[in-house]
Amino acid sequence: MTDPRETVPPGNSGEETIEEAFAWLDRTVEAINREAVNHHPRELIFQVWQRSWRYWHDEQGMSTSYTKYRYLCLIQMAMYMHAKRDGTCLGGGMGQKGGDQGPPPPPPPGLV
């Protein structure tokens, strides 16, 4: 059986470069977006991204990477609360892939 715990993200071992840390952030945001559409409406995901961008990037003047990080924190919390409350997935029960049968959504604007 594989270890279900998350691996240590870049930046914590002291051996990764900043480029590797940014690549990890990009991969993680894309992966959570792909999973989130199985549990939350696409429109909600895009609204969270757009509001995060407006607040953190436009109003607060933070970097794109920091904005992605704050967005990731919000989406992770939404996924956690969904699972904790035994939320039903858009495609049926927890763990089932379904709901949106099309290709995964494009990343939110600015993540390309």
UniProtKB/Swiss-Prot annotation:
The keyword Endoplasmic reticulum does not apply. Residues 61-80 are annotated as: Binds to human NUP153. One of its GO terms (biological process) is symbiont-mediated suppression of host innate immune response. A motif (Nuclear localization signal) lies at residues 65-72. Its main location: virion. Residues 90-101 have a biased composition (Gly residues). Residues 102-112 have a biased composition (Pro residues). Keywords: AIDS, Host nucleus, Host-virus interaction, Inhibition of host innate immune response by virus, Viral immunoevasion, Virion. Disulfide bonds: none annotated. InterPro entries: Lentiviral_Vpx_assoc_factor, RetroV_VpR/X. Residues 90-112 are annotated as: Disordered. Pfam families: VPR (PF00522). It comes from the Viruses. It is found in: Virion; Host nucleus. Gene3D superfamilies: 1.20.5.4730. One of its GO terms (cellular component) is host cell nucleus. Belongs to the lentivirus VPX protein family. Plays a role in nuclear translocation of the viral pre-integration complex (PIC), thus is required for the virus to infect non-dividing cells. Targets specific host proteins for degradation by the 26S proteasome. Acts by associating with the cellular CUL4A-DDB1 E3 ligase complex through direct interaction with host VPRPB/DCAF-1. This change in the E3 ligase substrate specificity results in the degradation of host SAMHD1. In turn, SAMHD1 depletion allows viral replication in host myeloid cells by preventing SAMHD1-mediated hydrolysis of intracellular dNTPs necessary for reverse transcription. Interacts with the P6 region of unprocessed GAG. Interacts with host VPRBP/DCAF1, leading to change substrate specificity of the CUL4A-DDB1 E3 ligase complex. Interacts with host NUP153. This is Protein Vpx. It comes from Human immunodeficiency virus type 2 subtype A (isolate NIH-Z). The gene is vpx.
